[in-house]
């Protein structure tokens, strides 16, 4: 076995080399691989720069090969050296700057909800070259290209009808975009200077089309107001004249200067240079901006006319005007004048005697007046209590019936001359249910030393009006 030569089928043996399975188709040569790499580089640069690069051949569609198992001889054959294309020195920097610029532009613009444009391949791109897009470089280039595409913004919808007052807003858009405008100042009105109006609106924020509310384009507030006339300056009484009115403009000029400084400070804070001098424009309605008629001159005190006192305004002058007082009657000589206070309106009303209600009673053909009935409630439920002892008074009778919730009053009738009890009294209730319970439970109970007898009170039947009404009814019926 030691003198045996190499086995047949190995390199160096005299026998033929037995090819392995699938070795009938040769592998890719170095030129084919070089062409594939050049095609991949050209595709990458076209994806990044968006145009074919001159001097580099386009990609050649590769022939799909069947994967083979390399043999030992094929593995030992040295491969041809691969020649890579030379890239210019500034190519990487130019591509990097382009990518950074497009990424910055894409970061400031919010892409719309609509999908991006479809992908279009380079010239000469065939279906067989789609396998080259699976590489990480191609995917990154495709992602950067899609991010760098500027999104399409939806057009701004304008209303079909715009009032003539708002049509001037379109002309003011150019001035609004150029820089900040001076704020419109509120004119002084009746010696009052209002605060400055809010500054002009800044540039619109980068929002998607659906984020802003629909409406007319933004414009200046001053362009929306019609031009009005300047209102009259505030007037103040002069020092030396005293009988006329004099215009005073120093306060108005000082207020306007202060407002101009405030508007300039706001304009500088907003980022723009301060514009020209502020223009005072009327911001009040036409009815309020019209000049008011001059008031009539009022008679002034002598001190103001002579210049001893400072000038006064109209409200102060009205308070200083003497009010006419009624002349006091002078008392006769030798007597002192005494001030008698006049009675007030309430005292006059109280002094009038109110019409008292008279309670006229009638029974057994006689009539009399009983003012004690005014102490009782006219809408109560009253019980007559008879057979009372001499020791029973109002407190004892009230203590006996006070256990009922709606108990109002109890009274024992006495003789006016002697003060002795007449042997009966009355108890009043507000609730009819308590009235019925008292009639049922307290009848025959001892109050003092005697049992009392209860019955319904007939006090209403003895009123003169009720008696006459009943008599008329009886006459109509023919009973009497």
UniProtKB/Swiss-Prot annotation:
InterPro entries: Nucleotide-bd_a/b_plait_sf (IPR012677), RBD_domain_sf (IPR035979), RBM42_RBP45_47-like (IPR050825), RBM42_RRM (IPR034215), RRM_dom (IPR000504). Residues 11-27 have a biased composition (Gly residues). Residues 381-459 form the RRM domain. It comes from the Eukaryota. Disulfide bonds: none annotated. The modification N-acetylalanine is found at residue 2. Pfam families: RRM_1 (PF00076). Residues 1-30, 319-356 are annotated as: Disordered. One of its GO terms (cellular component) is cytoplasm. SUPFAM superfamilies: RNA-binding domain, RBD. GO terms for biological process: mRNA splicing, via spliceosome; negative regulation of mRNA splicing, via spliceosome. Residues 345-356 have a biased composition (Basic and acidic residues). One of its GO terms (molecular function) is RNA binding. The modification Phosphoserine is found at residue 135. It is found in: Nucleus; Cytoplasm. Keywords: Acetylation, Cytoplasm, Methylation, Nucleus, Phosphoprotein, RNA-binding. Residues 236-480 are annotated as: Necessary for interaction with HNRNPK. The modification Asymmetric dimethylarginine is found at residues 153, 158, 168, 181. Interacts with HNRNPK. Belongs to the RRM RBM42 family. Binds (via the RRM domain) to the 3'-untranslated region (UTR) of CDKN1A mRNA. This is RNA-binding protein 42. The lineage of its organism: Eukaryota, Metazoa, Chordata, Craniata, Vertebrata. The gene is RBM42.
